[in-house]
């Protein structure tokens, strides 16, 4: 069972939630000690594994019929096997967020509450955002909320609104990009998403456009951030130019996102060390 939970948690994507915590901590901290403060350690630990078990566990429970025809589940990802023990562990991982949030500054609570609601209702009824075009993309701003919570948890203040907006737009683009390989299985199952509504080519153009907008918003925070985010629309251009299948390119993005996140984090750490 534990091996199955490990696979269910998508270890390849762990840093999609835990990585933003590092970014948020690096910009929220003002001293080296704050980088290793209790809020920083607790949030990173939660979003590294329990949050991933909850997010993807909920997804797999309510997508089990769709996943029967999803080719991604034949290799690096697993199909939901059911079982009471697995369901209980997934639920506990979600409820545990309340214990994580309790000792944190109140400024962090709205971001954690929003993350829980979006992580749940993205896949679960009654809202099931993932089956409504535009809302499926918009709700995936949940991936930037760990960064906002970490910033607030360490600093006791809210993060810059433009930084949250830029990150939200980036997450929207990532969601639709990752949904392009699922277009045919989703259509076969009668699921409507931004990607199925647009089709592969227009969905790819949508990703490029929203990533350009993300870069523009980040540039208002710091021009260097905007330049860094231009990597994403440039990659889309390369994918189209070289006619690389999105289903293949999809598996590059954990490395791409880790690299971009590392640069963001190093910038924050530079500010902590050098003022």
Curated annotation (Swiss-Prot):
Q: Which GO terms describe its molecular function?
A: transferase activity, transferring alkyl or aryl (other than methyl) groups
Q: Which Pfam families would you find in this protein's record?
A: UbiA (PF01040)
Say what happens when this gene is deleted. Answer: Loss of bacterioruberins production.
| One CC-aspect GO term | plasma membrane
Alphabetical keyword list: Carotenoid biosynthesis, Cell membrane, Membrane, Transferase, Transmembrane, Transmembrane helix
Which superkingdom is the protein from? Archaea
Q: What is its EC number?
A: 2.5.1.150
Name the enzyme group at the top EC level: transferase
Alphabetically, which GO biological process terms does the record hold?
Answer: carotenoid biosynthetic process
**Membrane association type:** Multi-pass membrane protein
Does this UniProt record's set of keywords contain Transmembrane helix?
yes
Q: Which residues cross the membrane?
A: 13-33, 38-58, 84-104, 107-127, 134-154, 160-180, 203-223, 225-245, 253-273
Q: In which pathway does it act?
A: Carotenoid biosynthesis
List localization entries.
Cell membrane
Briefly describe activity regulation.
Answer: Inhibited by bacterioopsin.
Q: What is the catalytic activity of this protein?
A: all-trans-lycopene + dimethylallyl diphosphate + H2O = dihydroisopentenyldehydrorhodopin + diphosphate; isopentenyldehydrorhodopin + dimethylallyl diphosphate + H2O = dihydrobisanhydrobacterioruberin + diphosphate
Task: List the InterPro entries hit by this protein, alphabetically.
Answer: Prenyltransferase_related, UbiA_prenyltransferase, UbiA_sf
Q: What is its main location?
A: membrane
The record's similarity note reads: Belongs to the UbiA prenyltransferase family.
Q: Please explain the role this protein plays, according to its UniProt record.
A: Involved in the biosynthesis of the acyclic C50 carotenoid bacterioruberin (BR). The enzyme acts at both ends of the substrate, and catalyzes the conversion of lycopene to the C(45) intermediate dihydroisopentenyldehydrorhodopin (DH-IDR) and the conversion of isopentenyldehydrorhodopin (IDR) to the C(50) carotenoid dihydrobisanhydrobacterioruberin (DH-BABR).
Name it. Lycopene elongase/hydratase
Q: Which organism is it from?
A: Halobacterium salinarum (strain ATCC 700922 / JCM 11081 / NRC-1)
Report which gene this protein is encoded by: lye
């Amino acid at each position: 069972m534990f091996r199955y939970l490990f696979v269910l948690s998508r270890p390849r994507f762990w840093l999609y939630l835990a990585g933003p915590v590092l970014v948020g901590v690096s910009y929220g901290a003002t001293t080296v000690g704050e980088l290793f403060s209790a809020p920083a350690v607790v949030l990173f630990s939660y979003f590294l594994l329990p949050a991933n078990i909850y997010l993807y566990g909920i997804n797999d429970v309510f997508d089990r019929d769709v996943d029967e025809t999803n080719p991604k589940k034949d290799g690096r990802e697993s199909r939901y096997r059911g079982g009471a023990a697995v369901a209980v562990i997934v639920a506990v991982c979600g409820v545990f967020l309340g214990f994580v949030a309790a000792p944190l500054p109140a400024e962090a609570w709205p971001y954690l509450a929003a993350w829980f609601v979006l992580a749940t209702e993205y896949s679960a009824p009654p809202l099931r955002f993932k089956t409504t075009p535009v809302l499926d993309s918009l709700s995936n701003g949940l991936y930037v909320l760990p960064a906002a919570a970490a910033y607030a948890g360490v600093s006791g203040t809210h993060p810059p609104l433009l930084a949250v907006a830029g990150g939200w737009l980036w997450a929207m683009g990532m969601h639709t990009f990752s949904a392009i390989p699922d277009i045919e299985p989703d259509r076969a199952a009668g699921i409507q998403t931004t990607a199925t509504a647009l089709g592969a080519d227009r969905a790819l153009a949508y990703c490029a456009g929203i990533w350009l907008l993300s870069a523009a918003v980040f540039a208002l925070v710091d021009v260097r951030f905007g330049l860094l985010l231009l990597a994403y629309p440039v990659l889309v251009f390369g994918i189209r130019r070289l006619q690389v299948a999105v289903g293949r390119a999809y598996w590059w993005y954990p490395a791409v996102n880790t690299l971009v996140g590392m640069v963001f984090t190093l910038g924050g750490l530079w500010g902590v060390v050098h003022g």
